[in-house]
């Protein structure tokens, strides 16, 4: 018997008996499993206005910040009202809508809800207007704004300084009707430089305050050529005016005086539209042609109506309204002599001062008493001329009285 075979069979190692069970082997080798992750915190419930947002047609976004209940907005939608419908409604129509809501659904509106609905509608209107204004501003900056046919027909790229040369070259130089005080030209040049520097510092996009409308008339003689850009850059402007007789159509690239007076009638129509819009919105209603009217005209496409030009010739329009026969006679006389529009404009002051002299020198009362002139501010230069002539007349009267009394004084 082979001893090696015996020992091998006796001490043969059984690997199946020596190996632990598979489960225990895995338990010993595999690392311990991490604990399961904690459950995420429960999401907060969305506000009531975010539920079924599409069913309210946008009312929830407009009413959410004004304390209006979701049920109230839902019932307004059930009545068939949308955001666009509410924005186009007047205040009395909104009151009727809220009364109908209370009567039909027997839903009592809170006092704050009644005011909140109107406040939300006004805020939405302002937001839409601001967006429209920004859009128009971007388009105008890009040069893509389209002028209407009337303004495009009479536009040119000639330098803005031409009208200033016309006024400087007008006839009758050196008279009191051209300048109120001596040295006025130098003062205007100094003021013009100050205005240019001041506007460069403030930026050309800053708009003038409407509360200083009447005070800003002082600069009408040089502000006519410096609109918007502070006199820094040339702007697209209308063809210059020429003196024409009543009913005469200007030839070539010119505009007649009948067209000029028609622009003032258009301004009156724009003022009426602005007043109607302000009444519908419950806002302050302007009574005179202010910056608000000029901005409205520009938005409506009538960019050929601008403040400097309309203020520059307002006294000419006043003479046309107060004494049309005298205005027509003046136009014919200057047309026959071949005078330019600057000379005609200066000559329009004298008949107005004569009219004021016959009515107690109260030029403001004359303007306010006329239906077509009451919407315009009295030009500062016209008021100064009336004051100057009144002072001269009073001085002459006092001199004549004192001179007549000297002869009767006793001689020592």
Curated annotation (Swiss-Prot):
This protein's GO CC annotations: nucleus
Function: Probable transcription factor required for the specification of floral meristem identity.
Compositionally biased intervals (Basic residues): 187-196
Superkingdom of origin: Eukaryota
GO MF: DNA binding
Feature: compositional bias, Pro residues: 31-47
DNA-binding region, residues: 237-241, 306-313, 377-380
Pfam families: C_LFY_FLO (PF17538), SAM_LFY (PF01698)
Residues carrying the site annotation Interaction with DNA: 284, 291, 295, 342
Protein name as it appears in the record: Protein ALF
Presence of keyword Transcription regulation: yes
GO process terms (BP): regulation of DNA-templated transcription
Biased composition regions of type Acidic residues, renumbered to the chain: 206-221
Tissue: Expressed in the floral meristem and also in the vegetative meristem.
Family: Belongs to the FLO/LFY family.
Keywords for the protein's UniProt record, in alphabetical order: Activator, Developmental protein, DNA-binding, Nucleus, Transcription, Transcription regulation
Organism: Petunia hybrida (Petunia)
Chain residue ranges for the region called Disordered: 1-47, 154-234
Lineage, highest ranks first: Eukaryota, Viridiplantae, Streptophyta, Embryophyta, Tracheophyta
Gene, per the UniProt record: ALF
Subcellular location field: Nucleus
